[in-house]
Amino acid sequence: MASLFASLGRSLIKLLIVLPVIIGLSISSPAMAAQWDAETLTVPAGSGGQQVTFSESEIKSASKLFKSNCATCHNQGVTKTNQNVGLDLEALSLASPARDNVDGLVEFLKNPMSYDGEYSIADTHPGISSSDVYVQMRTLNDEDLRLIAGYILTAEKVQGDQWGGGKIYF
């Protein structure tokens, strides 16, 4: 019986020593620290070079909006229906018009256009103007769209190549 208590005591002491170290490492990891710095939270506002800086709480709210409204088809920045077009910054910058800024993404969410900007895809892609596709997007207001755009533009900075990277990362 005494050896059982001694064994439990040693295990408890080890746990009390190791647990704070593990918690400390997870809280102070470089990825977590870099996740919310001003550079990460600053993204292009429009095509004219102006910038906008989101707050940490805005991006956290935006993450919830993205997950509840967009992640069904765009989980981790991948487009399920077209693997050639992701939500990574390079793909967004090559769209026409460019969608690598808040204004461009908000406009796309209001009026979805093909990647080359030639025709509307509102009948097949959810958006504020979409007919019967994912009608709950119609409940999003301009601020919600702005936050979702901010989340998309900061996600690659936080997640790296995994954002929009496709199947090789899953």
Curated annotation (Swiss-Prot):
Co-factor remark: Binds 1 heme c group covalently per subunit.
Keywords: Electron transport, Heme, Iron, Membrane, Metal-binding, Photosynthesis, Photosystem II, Signal, Thylakoid, Transport
A Pfam match: Cytochrom_C550
SUPFAM superfamilies to which the protein is assigned, alphabetical: Cytochrome c
Binding site for heme c: C70, C73, H74, H125
Membrane topology listed for this record: Peripheral membrane protein
Compartment(s): Cellular thylakoid membrane
Signal peptide location: 1-33
Cofactor: heme c
Molecular function terms, GO-annotated: electron transfer activity; heme binding; iron ion binding
GO BP annotations, alphabetical order: photosynthesis, light reaction; respiratory electron transport chain
InterPro entries: Cyt_c-like_dom (IPR009056), Cyt_c-like_dom_sf (IPR036909), Cytochrom_C550 (IPR029490), PsbV_cyt_c550 (IPR017851), PsbV_cyt_c550-like (IPR016003)
Gene3D superfamilies per record: Cytochrome c-like domain
GO cellular component: photosystem II; plasma membrane-derived thylakoid membrane
Description of how the protein assembles with itself and partners: PSII is composed of 1 copy each of membrane proteins PsbA, PsbB, PsbC, PsbD, PsbE, PsbF, PsbH, PsbI, PsbJ, PsbK, PsbL, PsbM, PsbT, PsbX, PsbY, Psb30/Ycf12, peripheral proteins PsbO, CyanoQ (PsbQ), PsbU, PsbV and a large number of cofactors. It forms dimeric complexes.
UniProt xrefs under NCBIfam families: PS_II_C550 (TIGR03045)
Family listed: Belongs to the cytochrome c family. PsbV subfamily.
Function statement: One of the extrinsic, lumenal subunits of photosystem II (PSII). PSII is a light-driven water plastoquinone oxidoreductase, using light energy to abstract electrons from H(2)O, generating a proton gradient subsequently used for ATP formation. The extrinsic proteins stabilize the structure of photosystem II oxygen-evolving complex (OEC), the ion environment of oxygen evolution and protect the OEC against heat-induced inactivation. Low-potential cytochrome c that plays a role in the OEC of PSII.
HAMAP family: PSII_Cyt550
The name this protein goes by in its record: Photosystem II extrinsic protein V
